[in-house]
Amino acid sequence: NPKINDFVASNPSFTNLHPLQPAESMQGALEVYYKTAKYLAEITGMDEFTLNPYAGAHGELVGLMIMKEYHYRRGDYKRTKVIVPDSAHGTNPASVNVAGMEVLEVASNPDGTVNIEDLKAVLSDEVAGIMLTNPNTLGIFEKDILAIKELARQYGALLYYDGANLNALLGITRPGDMGFDIVHLNLHKTFSTPHGGGGPGSGPVGVKKELAELLPNPRVVYEDGKYQIKYLPTAIGQISNFFGNFLVVLRAYTYILTLGKENLKYVGKLAVLNANYIKESLKDYYQVAVPGLCKHEVVFSGLKSKAVSTLDVAKRLLDYGYHPPTIYFPLIVHEALMVEPPETESKEILDGFIETMKTIAKEAIENPELLKTAPHNTVVRRLDEATAARKPILKYQDIINN
């Protein structure tokens, strides 16, 4: 999270605004909204964007609502199914269910890419769309994306892009150029906004022009030499209070302007370089889930020494001062450990992480119990996560009573 983002976002000219002010008195904020939407459209190859969703999963739901409404207005009421790969992020099928549609799971190849034959078997005139992440959750580019696009067109389905892995594509290609009709982004994944703590977040949704009228209200437009707020009757409705999380959008806008068009194109290349540097450095210690070139993230399938689990490795990383990477996802990878270095990490930082991972691999062989009882240097040691998940204590009074 670049400090310049927080410097701009803490400016009283922005923090003292109220969304019920007259539009004439907040032209600067409306300009940020308008231009951020235009920048995101250019970056992704979409035609229009809404910045109103509060987070990535919220954006997912909005995109699916647009998909559903598009078919409904065409009188195509039987399109109630959405195809989701078995390697997808868990929010994909969850969002489909919340949107009132049915999930059709399609099998993946060993590298996580969509099995085309399996896809053909589930396509029909009841399918509303296909949800894909590209690169997929194993960090592998969906090489058959153009063939998938043609199949979607053939059956009248829309193509939906989960933007969680957009980092790998910046400056190289765009979802719109691959044939995607709807895109949702996670500003914390690609545009340097705060990542943790449960929010606030932002999950902008972009669409091709055929779907633009469905984007939720309110809209920010530029007409008659000024920025205006409009509520269009063709929209799917209003999906958030006012304009979403403005200060998060402002941080992303700052990041885009700071890098500029010339430097944004290096984001994808550096993210891919960093991930492959880690993969090549650790492949003799940890099993690589998919051999060969990965994109912005590398997925390992546990240690080559089987004495300890991926969970043990993650817990031991805490002792060395590292926040553990994602573990046990994707679900189709046994003992998965996903490392996703951003484009901003220096070689020195990457080398420090690599050496720590090598040290842990050696500890697993020489003293596996050290890992199985980790962490040792944190205030709270290993938690009983299974009980915590099954019997959560969510109220302070329950803690007192126990």
Residue ranges, per PLM feature:
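Non-catalytic terminal extensions of PLP-dependent enzymes
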Residues: 1-47, 65, 223, 228, ...
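Cysteine-centered functional microenvironments
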Residues: 18-21, 53, 133
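Short, flexible loop/turn elements at secondary-structure junctions
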Residues: 55, 136, 165, 189, ...
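Catalytic-loop motifs flanking and including active-site residues across diverse enzymes
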Residues: 59, 199, 244-251, 294
